[in-house]
């Protein structure tokens, strides 16, 4: 049923596919903006897609599996939000091209790119330096570094046609305070801080802003091994100024702000959302 609904929605691409989002009670800072959100069928990515649509954007979600895309689209359309989706494996160039082409076919423009990419092969980053195989280094740096850069490269020409845009992606508190036993992950997330600064400089003349979010310990499937163990959870809370673990929703206002015109003079910034986790001066 969900697949049929998504196919039916995409089949109407020749007509207006911009559904009017309903039930909003606040100003819509992203009205008529078009946003691509990767890895957006669950957890933080899903919450980001939902919030951007609630704030007025027309959102294209993506994930590796069609059934997950269909379910997310059906759920969010059911809330009266303007939502479409397509399959996208961030490690495959053809999938990036299809994601961009889908957005352009449906909406004609791209204003926002939100990259919520996580390495899905969890066993490839829980290692120290001496335990880490070459495959783990390749996988982490490919997904958390190269794939993001190339995805942004694919979108920039379309943003330029629009006169500019906003790019955002996720680093981690581990970029500032490395997690013991997560060497490949720590290094790949630290690399994103450099990517953020570099692209902010390169893309500013094109009126494209680039900013980064660095979440702390947020309750997601990635961190499940920590918060599902009550003893570990309590130990983690001791490192926080705000004595609770984060929820995906804790980042949403900041993401929407960074994508909006309210942040038009912000680029190259990394915002920590970590409950006061000690991370830098």
Curated annotation (Swiss-Prot):
**Highest taxon, organism lineage:** Eukaryota
- The residue numbers the entry assigns to motif Peroxisomal targeting signal are 279-281
Name the InterPro entries on file: NAD(P)-bd_dom_sf (IPR036291), Sc_DH/Rdtase_CS (IPR020904), SDR_fam (IPR002347)
List the GO cellular component terms.
peroxisome
Q: In the Enzyme Commission scheme, what number(s) does this protein have?
A: 1.1.-.-
Q: Keywords assigned by UniProt?
A: NAD, NADP, Oxidoreductase
Q: Where does NADP(+) bind?
A: 36-60, 189
Q: Name one GO molecular function term.
A: carbonyl reductase (NADPH) activity
Cross-referenced Gene3D superfamilies? NAD(P)-binding Rossmann-like Domain
Pfam families documented for this protein: adh_short_C2 (PF13561)
**Listed GO biological process terms:** retinal metabolic process
List the active site: 185
Q: Where does substrate bind?
A: 172
Q: Relay the record's extra comment.
A: Three homologous proteins DHRS4, DHRS4L1, and DHRS4L2 are derived from gene duplication of DHRS4, and the gene cluster is arranged in tandem in chromosome 14.
Say what the protein does: Putative oxidoreductase.
Quote the PANTHER family the UniProt record gives: DEHYDROGENASE/REDUCTASE (SDR FAMILY) MEMBER 4, DEHYDROGENASE_REDUCTASE SDR FAMILY MEMBER 4-LIKE 1-RELATED
The record's similarity note reads: Belongs to the short-chain dehydrogenases/reductases (SDR) family.
Protein's name in the database = Putative dehydrogenase/reductase SDR family member 4-like 1
Gene symbol of the encoding locus: DHRS4L1
């Amino acid at each position: 049923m969900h697949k049929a609904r998504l196919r039916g929605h995409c089949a109407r691409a020749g007509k207006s596919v911009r559904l009017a989002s309903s039930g909003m009670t606040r100003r819509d800072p992203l009205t008529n903006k078009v946003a691509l959100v990767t890895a957006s069928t669950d957890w933080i990515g899903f919450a980001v897609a939902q919030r951007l649509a609630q704030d007025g954007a027309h959102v294209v979600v993506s994930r590796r599996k069609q059934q997950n895309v269909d379910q997310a689209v059906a759920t969010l359309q059911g809330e009266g939000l303007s939502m479409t989706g397509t399959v996208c494996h961030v490690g495959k160039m053809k999938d990036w091209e299809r994601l961009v082409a889908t957005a352009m076919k449906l909406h004609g423009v791209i204003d926002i790119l939100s990259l919520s990419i996580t390495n899905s092969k969890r066993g490839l980053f829980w290692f120290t330096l001496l335990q880490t195989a070459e495959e783990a280094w390749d996988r982490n740096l490919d997904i958390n570094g190269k794939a993001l850069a190339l995805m942004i490269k694919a979108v920039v020409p379309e943003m330029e046609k629009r006169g500019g845009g906003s790019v955002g992606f996720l680093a981690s508190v581990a970029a500032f305070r490395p997690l013991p036993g997560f060497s490949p992950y720590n290094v790949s997330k630290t690399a994103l801080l450099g990517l953020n600064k570099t692209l902010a400089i390169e893309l500013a003349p094109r009126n494209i802003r680039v900013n980064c979010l660095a979440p702390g310990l947020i309750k997601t499937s990635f961190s499940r091994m920590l918060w599902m163990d009550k003893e570990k959870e309590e130990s983690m809370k001791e490192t926080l100024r705000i004595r609770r673990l984060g929820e995906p929703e804790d980042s949403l206002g900041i993401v929407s702000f960074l994508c909006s015109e309210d942040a038009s003079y912000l680029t190259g910034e990394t915002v920590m959302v970590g409950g006061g986790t000690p991370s830098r001066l």
